[in-house]
Amino acid sequence: MASLSDPAVREFLTRGTRTGKLGYLAASGRPLVTPVWFIVEADSLVFNTGKDTAKGRALARDPRASLCVDLEEPPFGFVQVQGEAELSEDPAELLRTATAIAARYMGAERAEEFGKRNGVPGELVVRLRPVKVLAVFDMTG
């Protein structure tokens, strides 16, 4: 089984601006998937979401989630992280993570702007702590 400490997994997850597809459960038990911007920090995948969004409410109710990141061109591949979400509303952590995520996806020149917009009260920092990591880097061979 792969892990987030594996350099190949980390390189795959952090390359460019690949979007994660977050899987979680609605209150009815129905599976849902939504795109998220994320960063890798230590042993977790980290993203922000609103406390009162479907994602925020669902993860507060049931922290089980999975996040899949894929390569949509040859040689095709993916990393799937299954785990438990930990939620934080700490203002300093919100601003720091929102700014880091913005730097990855919007560029350093707009990081502060988007960090201030997204790192505000009512938002959550979500840390997906892996229970299982699956990785396939070349699906053509």
Residue ranges and their predicted role:
Residues V46, T53, K132-L134:
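Glycine-rich nucleotide phosphate-binding loop and flanking beta-alpha elements
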Residues L13-R15, A60-R61, G119:
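Alpha-helix boundary recognition
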Residues T53-K55, P74:
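Short, surface-exposed beta-strand-loop junctions and turns on beta-sheet-rich folds
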Residues S5-V9, K55, T97:
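Hydrophobic alpha-helical segments typical of transmembrane helices
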Residues R18-K51, L59, A65-V69, F78-Q80:
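Short beta-strand segments
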Residues S28-R30, E73-P75, K116-V120:
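A short beta-turn/loop motif at secondary-structure boundaries
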Residues M1-G16, P75:
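Extreme N-terminal tail/first-helix region
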Residues M1-L4, F78-G141:
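Charged, gly/pro-rich active-site loop segments
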